Amino acid sequence: MKAVKMCLFFLFAQAGLCFAQQKQFKALLVTTTKGWHHESLHYGVLAIKDLGVKNYFDVVLLENPNGFTDKYLEEFQVVIFLNTTGDILDSAQQRVMERFIQSGKGYVGIHSASDTEYDWEWYNKLVGRMFQIHPVIQTARIKITDDKFPGLQGFANDKLWTDEWYEFGPEKISGLNYILTVDESSYDPRVQWGEKKGVGMGKQHPVAWYHNYDGGRSFYTALGHLPAIYSDPVFLNHLYAGIFWAATGKK
């Protein structure tokens, strides 16, 4: 009888262990940079790993894209580009990313993910809009433009936010759903880099958006330049909502 009880104990223990290891989804966190390397990258990695612990999803860090293959990506539901810059994937790896999204999975771009892969038209459409220029870091007012998307509660009532405010080029694809904008009357968008000038984007200056693309899902937020942002619960709630939607399609 004692032996039977011991067997049952181990069976239930193993079943409990298997159950405990079942996570909501698995995210691949890509941090490759071939251009500017953000000081905040380290803090972003820690923050997203902590989001995984708190919200019960797995996070795997990929700093070198050499392992970016169809086989490797099979186990993931979402790929996150955290402050990536420059041309980080070769042509074969680009096709892998395309097939990943076409299989019904998701992408999340954070801040300088829009300063990545300018010559890859498919990726430009995946992100939706590409970075052009930015003024100095300033405090400005953020406005919610779609309160039906989750994770935006902390931005209510024209919240003041300090960040690097990207000015974007034209839409690369129609159907972008804007969820946050920045009020240009609350900061100075003017900037000049040599012959390149920034004058702002007017009343509709997007900061975050999402859309369905090529069979999968894409979420992008321009917030996330400064290290301190990655310990702000308002930003982390916003970021997790985007990750969750991109991975699952649920709001």
Predicted regions mapped to residue ranges:
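Catalytic beta-strand/loop cores that center a nucleophilic Ser/Cys/Thr
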Residues: 135-214
